Amino acid sequence: MNVYSALKEIFKQNISCSSENIQLEESLGRTLSKPLRINKNIPEFDTSSMDGFAVKKSSLGKIVRFKILGETAAGADSDFVINPNECVRVYTGSRMPKNADFVVIQENTRLEGNFIHVNGYDKNSPYVRKLGLDFKKGQTISHPILIDYKLISALASLNFEKVSVIKKPRVCIIPTGNEILALGSKAKKK
């Protein structure tokens, strides 16, 4: 049987791959075998994507001096509600104050006691990661999909400990023919 006929016979076979459940940290480079349903929004709330000061965007341009009400560290709750002339110190990953929708990055501010002076800002860059930006509750991650670092990070934040992946195939290579030589052998000339 020639190579092309053999390949044709192989491809006629209905080869299916079974799946296995493995620890998330072992899944890099593997292929997801079942869809995953997302059980919560990621991020779970609006967060700052930069270190700076949370303000109301509508206040920018009208007001250049803002009173600092306090700060919200990453991982902490924020009960702050700001007025147009107020701000809250935020850090990357911090929860945004309930009615703030813009972060003036710290490089564009000057500290004056308990106030900041805004030196400039890019109105097209609010530096806010909105609730559900990465994943929305109820969303499905389809399969098959190659699991990379980004997906592992997201699944870890969603508390997935195990994932269902396609089992690694067992492959055998069976060389045949006189072109195969033992190590150290020399090919015969015709």
Residue spans for each PLM region:
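Short, glycine/charged-enriched hinge/interface segments at domain edges or termini
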Residues: 54-190
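Short, low-complexity N-terminal leaders and the immediately following helix N-cap/first helix
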Residues: 1-65, 130
